[in-house]
Amino acid sequence: MLSDLNPSFDGISKISDYNFDKFELKVLGIARLLFESNEYPIAQTWKSAFLKAEQNFSSPFGASIAHIISISIDFMSNGRTSNFNYFKENNNSSLTLITDEERYFLMALKSIRNNNISKANSYAVMLCEGPQINKFLLAMEGIAIITGDIEKKAAGFNGAVDGARTRDPRRDRPVL
């Protein structure tokens, strides 16, 4: 977590320098609350994340989107060895600044939504700090499926997201 820093700080840039759409910025706000919830569980900011998702996205999609963002964060965190830098959602700088890690997170989502699998893989490797990216990408794919940006069986991915489970294509049912 970062306090009020300026954009000249290494690893921090202006959100306006990137072409994030409104949906992606809403995802960032929800993700920031979930990042904080992982760092400070007693704060229970996950409740605020789900509430914000319900307010930003029509029912029943809000809770589903928050849930999949939470799953993607869990999968991302599994391989990371260094700290994850983020801005708290209620921080004054959160409206204008973004950390490299937050940017990689959003760029992975943007790349999946644009069906640019190679770019999504690159951002996922930087974010997850290694090659264990498949579950993270499947979770991010789930966000794009909910929004209708991609079909359930997107080229380049080995499955679709159903919660945290993948589908067995031979049986077309969830693998537990």
Predicted segments, located by residue:
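Polar/charged low-complexity regulatory segments
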Residues: 1-106, 110-159, 165, 170-176
